[in-house]
């Protein structure tokens, strides 16, 4: 039996679930059920397949977030491929194919390509379709999974099936772009069309050979990029300059629409790409009034709403069909039928050089996290959590001084030539232009308040004097 390696596509910045989804914390890292994130669920649902460790492909800027989420489910194993620049799905999958052939000695593994931000409600049907597709993939076919449509949907591409090549498997007649409503309705009524899920199964060599034949520029650039892989803790770093030369293209355009070896396997597993707040409402558990409620919420005489609150109490009276999402720094109120226009809010924030589209007030770092409590002219207050054993790299700031007050735990601090320890209710002052580090030597998290003061308080006022991951000494 061929080794099966999941390839999880975790790139993208996702704006359709703003304000929960941000550039630095996109939807694949969100939890839609209050427990695991979409990325974690994507990996966990593969457990019955007894597959190899997943290869996760992500943006360089999301690397520590991915690493922490994999660590939390015991799936971190030097298996995160970093894209130095975005080049769409065809090159990303090629990187995974090349890496898998390097990692699996004397084998040509099957690659199960999945998006990190999809929801599957019927996992048994999902796994059955994968097991069925393995037969065709081992024969050199490039299998795509077509979702049996439940309605006329204009937001998805479609796959038209051709001749049957076995039970519940067909050749691909054509891939079609997102249709208008009447065309989509015709597709659904014909029972010959499936939603294009963006999920695939094929041998690593089969994909690379088709890519080489159909898109040789992509193949060559990716081969060059993995020619000098630089392992970096849990990350696989490819050659940035070589990959920057790669054309940007999707797997559909570069390969699947042109190959003679495409096979579509239908799947009816309660799939959703969670592409909007309304689709999230569709798949979520509802109360008797068909409201989806997350947080401290009282909905009176209100129906068909999606209401989410991080911390504040929200009450509604006599409202229907709304999406209300409140985070620490933003509030979205929209008719459920208009949520596709949330992109206009993101565009507005970008045009006005605001931060609410980019990051949350709580920001994750390799050593832990911080949240902005308050800010004003020439000062900024943060609450910082440092993981056990983690530390800041040696650094200094040109334009700001810092006061550190320990709330709980113990901090081992290097300030200039001094090395000392402070504990709960103790503090220290770090002047500007002073080299300093901080480590949590304990087995419990370190909590501290940081008060910054100075003429320039942006995150880029930092001079790092050592390269440091934040995980180890």
From Swiss-Prot:
Keywords for this protein: GTP-binding, Lipopolysaccharide biosynthesis, Nucleotide-binding, Nucleotidyltransferase, Transferase
Catalytic activity entry: alpha-D-mannose 1-phosphate + GTP + H(+) = GDP-alpha-D-mannose + diphosphate
Recorded GO MF terms: GTP binding; mannose-1-phosphate guanylyltransferase (GTP) activity
Matches recorded under CDD domains: cupin_PMI_typeII_C, GDP-M1P_Guanylyltransferase
Superkingdom, taxonomy of origin: Bacteria
Regions that span the bilayer: none
Chain's role: Involved in GDP-mannose biosynthesis which serves as the activated sugar nucleotide precursor for mannose residues in cell surface polysaccharides. This enzyme participates in synthesis of the LPS group C2 O antigen.
Family designation: Belongs to the mannose-6-phosphate isomerase type 2 family.
PANTHER family (UniProt xref): MANNOSE-1-PHOSPHATE GUANYLYLTRANSFERASE
Known partners and oligomeric status: Homodimer.
Name of this chain's protein: Mannose-1-phosphate guanylyltransferase
Organism: Salmonella muenchen
Lineage: Bacteria, Pseudomonadati, Pseudomonadota, Gammaproteobacteria, Enterobacterales
Gene: rfbM
């Amino acid at each position: 039996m061929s080794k099966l390696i999941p390839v999880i596509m975790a790139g993208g910045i996702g704006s359709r679930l703003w304000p929960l989804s941000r550039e630095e914390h996109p939807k694949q890292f969100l939890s839609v059920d209050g427990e695991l994130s979409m990325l974690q669920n994507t990996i966990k649902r593969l457990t019955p397949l007894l597959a190899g460790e997943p290869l996760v492909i992500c943006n360089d800027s999301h690397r520590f977030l991915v690493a922490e989420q994999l660590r939390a489910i015991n799936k971190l194993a030097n298996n995160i491929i970093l894209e130095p620049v975005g080049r769409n799905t065809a090159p990303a999958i090629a990187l995974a194919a090349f890496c898998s052939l390097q990692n699996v000695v004397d084998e040509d593994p099957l690659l199960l390509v999945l998006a990190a931000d999809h929801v599957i409600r019927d996992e048994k049907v999902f796994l059955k379709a994968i097991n069925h597709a393995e037969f065709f993939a081992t024969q050199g076919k490039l299998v795509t999974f077509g979702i049996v449509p439940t309605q006329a949907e204009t937001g998805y591409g479609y796959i038209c099936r051709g001749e049957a090549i076995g039970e519940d498997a067909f050749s691909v007649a054509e891939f079609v772009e997102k249709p208008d409503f009447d065309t989509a309705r015709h597709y659904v009524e014909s029972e010959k069309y499936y939603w294009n899920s963006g999920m695939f199964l094929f041998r690593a060599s089969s994909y690379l050979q088709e890519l080489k034949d159909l898109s040789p520029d992509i193949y060559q650039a990716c081969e060059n990029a993995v020619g000098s892989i630089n392992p970096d803790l849990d990350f696989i770093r490819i050659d940035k300059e070589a990959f920057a030369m790669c054309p940007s293209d999707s797997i559909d355009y570069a390969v699947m629409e042109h190959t003679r070896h495409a096979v579509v396997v239908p799947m009816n597993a309660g799939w959703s790409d969670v592409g909007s707040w309304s689709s999230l409402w569709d798949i979520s558990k509802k109360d008797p009034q068909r409201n989806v409620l997350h947080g401290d919420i009282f909905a009176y005489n209100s129906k068909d709403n999606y209401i989410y609150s991080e911390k504040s109490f929200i009450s509604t009276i006599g409202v229907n069909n709304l999406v209300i999402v409140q985070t620490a720094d933003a509030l979205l109120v929209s008719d459920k039928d208009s949520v596709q226009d949330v992109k206009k809010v993101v565009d507005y924030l970008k045009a006005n050089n605001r931060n609410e589209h980019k990051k949350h007030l709580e920001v994750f770092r390799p050593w832990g996290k911080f949240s902005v409590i308050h800010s004003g002219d020439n000062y900024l207050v943060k609450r910082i959590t440092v993981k056990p054993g983690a530390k800041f790299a040696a650094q200094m700031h040109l334009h700001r001084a810092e006061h550190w007050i320990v709330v709980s735990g113990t901090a081992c601090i290097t300030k200039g030539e001094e090395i000392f320890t402070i504990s709960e209710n103790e503090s220290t002052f770090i002047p500007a232009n002073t080299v300093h580090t901080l480590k949590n030597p304990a087995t419990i998290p370190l909590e501290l308040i940081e008060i910054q003061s100075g003429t320039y308080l942006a995150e880029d006022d930092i001079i790092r004097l050592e390269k440091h991951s934040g995980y180890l000494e």
